[in-house]
C-alpha cells in the first residue's frame, strides 16, 4: 500500500509570500487555513520509511507538521526520511537539503545535471557525503531507492523529461552539468511494487505533449503543476513581467491549459501542486476554484494524504 503526503502545495515563496500584498497573500496573512508551504511531497511503500520529492525551503516546518516524518519514540537521533528525489535544481526544490545536515543518513537521487549544480555550490558540502550519498538517475531508466541500511524500498521510480526550463538562477550562465535540455525538468512515475499502483508527479511542466498524455492516461493519481491560472497572471496582477510559459509552467486554464489538456485521460484523482500565490484558485470561494473542482481537480491543503 503506497502512501503519498503533500507536505507543501505552494510554488516558490509560499502562501503568503513574506513580501507580497496581492489579494491571495493578504487573505492568507489573515486566515491560517489558506496558508501553504513550498512544494514538496513524501511517498512510502510501508508507512515507516519515506522518500521526499524535492526538499522545500520550508522542510523543517513541514516535518514538524507531519507526524509520519517525526523521529521514532525512544531514539535520540532518527528520521523516517530515507532519501530525497529531486525533479529539478530550482531553489525551492533543493534549499531544504540544508535543513538535513545534522548527521542522519539518507540518499539524494537526481539527474547528473542537478547533482553537478549541488557539487558546484560549496554550501551543500554541509551534507557529509559519508552519510548523504548522491546517486545519479537517468531518464526513462527504472530504479528502486534503498533505505539507509541498503534494504530495497518497495518503490520503483522512473524519471522522465518534461517540457520546461533550467533553474532561473543559472539563466545566462554555463550550467555545471551541461546545457542540454534533458534533466532540467523531470516528472516521476512511482510504482508500489507490491500492488502495481502508480502515481505521476510533475511539479513543473511547460506543456502537455502527446507522449505525456499517453503516460498519464488512466492513472490512479496525478500531482501536476498548478503554478498559474492564466499564462499572463503575474503581468496582469502587476506582480512580475514573465508569463507562466516563460517560467516553464503551463497555465491551468485556457484551450491549451492543463485542465483542458488532461481532461479526457480518465485520471482517477488529480491534484494541483506548486501553486503560485498569485493564483486565485487558492481561494475556496473563487470562480477559478469552482471551475477547477468542476473539472475534477483538487487544490490540496498541506498535509493532504492519499493512500493507494
Curated annotation (Swiss-Prot):
Pfam families: Lactamase_B_2. May be involved in the transport of PQQ or its precursor to the periplasm. Belongs to the PqqB family. Pathway: Cofactor biosynthesis; pyrroloquinoline quinone biosynthesis. GO terms for biological process: pyrroloquinoline quinone biosynthetic process. Keywords: PQQ biosynthesis, Transport. This is Coenzyme PQQ synthesis protein B. The keyword Transport applies. InterPro entries: Metallo-B-lactamas, PQQ_synth_PqqB, RibonucZ/Hydroxyglut_hydro. The lineage of its organism: Bacteria, Pseudomonadati, Pseudomonadota, Alphaproteobacteria, Hyphomicrobiales. PANTHER family: COENZYME PQQ SYNTHESIS PROTEIN B, HYDROLASE C777.06C-RELATED-RELATED.
